[in-house]
Every structure is written in structure tokens, then in C-alpha cells.
Regions:
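Zymogen propeptides
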Residues: 27-33, 38-166, 243
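Polar/charged alpha-helical tracts
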Residues: 16, 124, 197-200
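Intrinsically disordered, low-complexity segments enriched in small/polar residues
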Residues: 3, 74, 89, 148, ...
Length: 319
């Protein structure tokens, strides 16, 4: 997650033995006391080494894994992997992208708040809702463990009625359109688009942090923390891009990296970061299973190998 409220939470390898992230709902408030005790040992016995400096960007075509990186999964569904031109200090610095044609695939907003308040991992949501793929729907509130940090509505169900007006929460993903006068899915930029008019055109919305604006400009985000991340993007042709990195970067770093890749990016918004970061696809003989790990100030390790339970996901099905 990318939340100031988590800055006082510390990682420790001792926490891994608790196995709390296997529970149906990760009770982070209860985890705080365990982490506090663990950090006493962490601070006393672990030496902090200086973070290695990342390598300088490589602007040549060598940052691509292939000159034609896209692999077809099905009609209107493709995937690609890229070597980041800026190397992270942890992991393989690989970026996974799933490209989805919204003319062929419908998007579903799935919230625990309208599904018996049951949290599920991404693979569990995938199976339960008969999806082809799914991803985080945004950061969730750590207090109630259900509501999105920003506005979220799905048809008549309101997960969070409140607009978040801080921390660059200027992007609202809108889909399940009411008529064909608008695109089937879009990221509404509150800084340059008419929200009052567009909110009448769709059934499903989720609000989050803007990374790249409607004018292809990087938002000036000064946060110095680094995270594994999954993002929601749109390209110049109106395709959806699900973008994942397990290797951690700052928000600004990663935005710059994305604009350097051959993705034809139009807009990008943040979905989730750290160990909650989830991306899962299984269809037509192809499986992509990605989970995040590193998060500054909370989970400063690349050791996470399990999906964490989530209250809200976005999934796709064929039209």
C-alpha cells in the first residue's frame, strides 16, 4: 500500500513465522503488537547496510526482452515482459504487462462489501467469480478492511461514497457504460475532464492516485518510498494495460520507466503496492501469477511468496 498511516510499521523476518497472511482476513491492527515486539529483535540484531545505487538507465532497445514483446493469449488479450531500463536494488527488474481490448472483454468490479464481506486472494476471486484474470481494485481502508480508500461504486452498491481529495487522488476508473456515447472504459482525470457529466455515463467506478495524466504528464509525486506495484493504464488506442513490477521503485521512477517503454501509454493510475499487490490470469492455456513483496517501512524484503487476501478486485470476462 501507499499510505502514510503505514510508515510506523516495521518488517521483520520473525513475522513470517506467524503465518497471519494465510488467514481469511489479514487483521493488520492485531498484527501491530506482534510487529512491535519483532522489531525490538530486528533493531537489536540486524545491521542496516546502505542501499545499493540503481544502475543508470539504459535507453537502448536492450531493455526489451524481445523486439516484438507481445505474446497473444487470446483474441484481444496479450502479454509482454520488459527489462526495466532502471534497475531496482532488489529482484529481477522485470515489468509484466497485460493488454486487454475492451471491445472483446467486459470488466467486473468485485467487492467483499457486497459478497458477504469475505476477503479472498486473487486466485480465489478468479475461481469464485469465473474470471479470466483479476487485479487489485485499489488500496483498501485498513480500519474497516472493506472500503476503497477513494470513491467506489458498482451499479447500486456503494462501497465508499466519499471522494478522497488528497495525495493526488485525481483518477477515477469508469467502466460498465450505460450507452455508447462514451468509451467502454476510461480513466477519468478529475483535473481535465468533466466528472459531473461523465459520472452519469457509467455504472462502475473506483478512485485512486493519478500517476500519468490525460496529457501524458507525470504527476509530481515526491514520496521517496519504494514498492512492488500494480497499475491500471490506458494506451493511445483505448486498450487497457495492467502493469506489474515486483521489484520496488518510487512512484516517479516507475512513471518515467513506463513512458520510456513501447507501450503508447495515454494515462496511468495506481492500484496497489507492497505484498498485497496481486495479478492473476489463467485462460487459454496461459497462466500468469504475480504477487508483490517489498514496501518501504512495512515489508522491506523480497521474501513474500503468497497472495494476500483482498476485499476488492477488478476482473475480466469475455463479452
Amino acid at each position: 500500500m501507499l499510505l502514510s498511516g503505514r510508515n510506523n510499521r516495521h518488517p521483520s523476518s520473525l513475522v513470517y513465522n506467524v503465518h497471519l497472511f494465510k488467514l481469511p482476513v489479514l487483521q493488520k491492527s492485531k498484527l501491530a503488537s506482534i510487529i512491535t515486539i519483532s522489531c525490538i529483535f530486528y533493531q537489536n540484531f540486524v545491521v542496516d547496510f546502505p542501499e545499493p545505487k540503481p544502475a543508470m538507465p539504459d535507453n537502448s532497445v536492450q531493455h526489451r526482452i524481445a523486439e516484438k514483446p507481445w505474446q497473444k493469449i487470446d483474441e484481444g488479450l496479450e502479454t509482454a515482459e520488459f527489462n526495466s531500463p532502471q534497475k531496482s536494488f532488489i529482484g529481477d527488474s522485470r515489468i509484466t504487462v497485460i493488454r486487454i481490448n475492451p471491445d472483446r472483454y467486459a470488466f467486473k468490479l468485485i467487492a467483499a462489501s457486497e459478497n458477504n464481506k469475505q476477503h479472498k486472494t486473487a486466485p480465489e476471486w478468479y475461481k469464485d467469480k469465473k474470471l479470466l484474470a483479476c487485479v487489485n481494485a485499489g488500496q483498501f481502508n485498513l480500519d474497516d478492511q472493506l472500503s476503497n480508500m477513494g470513491y467506489m461504486k458498482n451499479y447500486s452498491h456503494v462501497n465508499n461514497p466519499n471522494f478522497r481529495k488528497i495525495n493526488n487522488y485525481n483518477s477515477i476508473l469508469a467502466f460498465n457504460r450505460k450507452d455508447t456515447s462514451v468509451a467502454p472504459i476510461q480513466i477519468i482525470d478529475l483535473k481535465c475532464q468533466d466528472w459531473a457529466q461523465l459520472q452519469t455515463k457509467y455504472h462502475s467506478f473506483t478512485q485512486s492516485i493519478s500517476l500519468i495524466t490525460c496529457n501524458k504528464q507525470i504527476v509530481d509525486n515526491k514520496q521517496k518510498g519504494k514498492w512492488s506495484m500494480v497499475l491500471f493504464g490506458m494506451d493511445e488506442k483505448g486498450n487497457v494495460l495492467w502493469i506489474f513490477t515486483r521489484s520496488p521503485y518510487t512512484i516517479r521512477q516507475f512513471s518515467e520507466i513506463l513512458l520510456s517503454l513501447p507501450l503508447a501509454i495515454q494515462q496511468v493510475m495506481y492500484l496497489e503496492g507492497g505484498p498485497e499487490t496481486s495479478l492473476y490470469l489463467e485462460t487459454n492455456g496461459k497462466k500468469i501469477a504475480k504477487m508483490g513483496s517489498y514496501e518501504t517501512g512495512f515489508w522491506e524484503s523480497d521474501a513474500n511468496q503468497q497472495y494476500w487476501p483482498l476485499p476488492n478486485v477488478i476482473g475480466i470476462v469475455k463479452k
